[in-house]
Regions:
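Conserved catalytic cysteine-centered active-site region
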Residues: 1-22, 47-74, 157, 163-192
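Condensing-enzyme catalytic core mediating Claisen C-C bond formation in acyl metabolism
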Residues: 57, 61-140, 146-147
């Protein structure tokens, strides 16, 4: 019984983030009232050989933002979220006996592309542009963001660019969470996984610690080293991909 629009997104490791952004666009222009966004990633020799050729895999542990970080560890799996318009939600609640509260709100999306400037090297200025656009799209100020769920794969160049982008985007750095020390880098599905992680943080009032990181290389960044109780309201999620494609989105507590 499913119909209407079907799309497969493949903009590298930003794919999940862009899929969420496209879903938001479809809802905003009233092309549909509900979107199922699925992120999937297979791991194995056939899917990882070309990735490995880039020389970005660690032979140690994943250490996001650590002074001794040496690369990423690929992982896979699947994650799924369902987005619906506020109008459709309210209409459905009037017709159904079972009531429920939305788990969270997708409030903003931003994107940028390095283009010909540096397609294979992360650039802080373009990552910052993606974050700022997501905050603006959510009709928020930078001070309204209380948590950043970072891309933070543990690569030397990638983490440095993101740390610089965060510093350039915020007058006061919010809490920064990096989960890939626990999950590995889920590649194409990472953005959807982040949406689930952000929702769980909002639901249960906590921020997970940065597993694998022992020596924060960026002391100006408010990196969450140990799991802590915290009640976030607006979480900015980053997904950046090889080829210079960047996606950021804001998950907010539904009020």
């Amino acid at each position: 019984g499913y119909g209407h629009f079907l799309c497969f997104m493949a903009p590298a490791c930003a794919g999940g983030g862009h899929a969420i952004g496209l879903a938001q666009m479809l809802l905003n222009i009233h092309q549909t009232e509900m979107v199922i966004v699925v992120g999937m990633q297979e791991t194995g020799p056939s899917s990882m050989q070309s990735f490995d050729a880039l020389g970005v895999f660690t032979t140690d542990a994943v250490r996001p933002f650590d002074r001794h970080r040496s690369g990423l560890a690929p992982s896979g799996g699947a994650a799924c979220i369902i987005l619906e318009s506020e109008y459709f939600y309210r209409m459905r609640m009037e017709d159904e006996d079972i009531k429920h509260t939305p788990l969270a709100r997708l409030s903003g999306y931003g994107f940028s592309t390095n283009g010909l400037r540096s397609p294979c090297t992360p650039l802080a200025s373009y990552e910052s542009a993606s974050m700022v656009q997501a905050i603006d799209d959510a009709l928020l100020d930078e001070g309204d963001i209380d948590v950043i769920l970072a891309h933070a794969t543990g690569t030397p160049a990638g983490d440095e660019a993101e740390a610089t982008a965060i510093k350039d985007s915020f007058t006061l750095c919010p809490h920064v969470v990096a989960t890939k020390g626990m999950t590995g880098h889920e590649c194409w599905m990472a953005g959807v996984s982040q949406a689930v992680q952000a929702t769980l943080m909002i639901q249960h009032g906590f921020l997970p610690g940065c597993v694998g990181t022992e020596d924060n290389a960026f002391p100006d960044m408010k990196l969450v080293m140990k799991t802590m109780k915290y009640a976030p309201h607006n979480i900015l999620c980053n997904s950046f991909g090889f080829g210079g494609t960047n996606a950021s989105f804001v998950i907010s507590k539904d009020v």
